[in-house]
Amino acid sequence: LLMTVPHLKDKVKGMLYMTRYGDTTDIIRHGLTKIRDGSEAIINAPKFAQLLNVILLFGNYLNATGIKGGAYGFRISSINKLVDTKAADGTTLLHFVERTVTRCFPELEGFVDELSAATEACRVQLLDLKHDLSELKSANVHHKKILDRLHSENEENVEAPYSKLMLPFLNKATNELHRLTDQIQYTERVFNEAMRYYGEGPDPVRRSFTG
């Protein structure tokens, strides 16, 4: 009996799209919020900025006689190298920085709290959110075209249960996807602003705090 339903395959795909749509848009929306909050957190993190200055001083001291001495800054990703510089007893530069901050700059220890939102943002990839949104927009256009074709084939299809269910949903989704597109563009601007604030130029490949 089901096989006699016109355009059954297209209708089933449309229903599946509708059931998955809400979860996907929620993931995108929550992910964008985390990235925006994380970007704003690292811009408004004075203790973290001061900590970077301390690390820069250490780096310049260690490289005082080399070509890297007297640097005005360093890439954020270079912080990972603090564990690679070791003394004879195995103590890393990270250990030394930690002890120095605790002893001489205890007021900077709260930088971790400043970056709590950025920690959440590390779990989100902006490129993944953009990809998910692009797939939703393509699917929405596809199912709208199918619905238009059904209506052109037979005017009675306009009043069919599938059309009455899908048409309002697709129209609403179209507007919502436009808003999500605007939100992604705004989030990307905020993210790039945070990268530039720390001297990290916008990178089309790097769209997360872990990059």
Give each language-model segment a name.
Residues L1-G211:
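Extended alpha-helical domain cores of large, multidomain eukaryotic proteins
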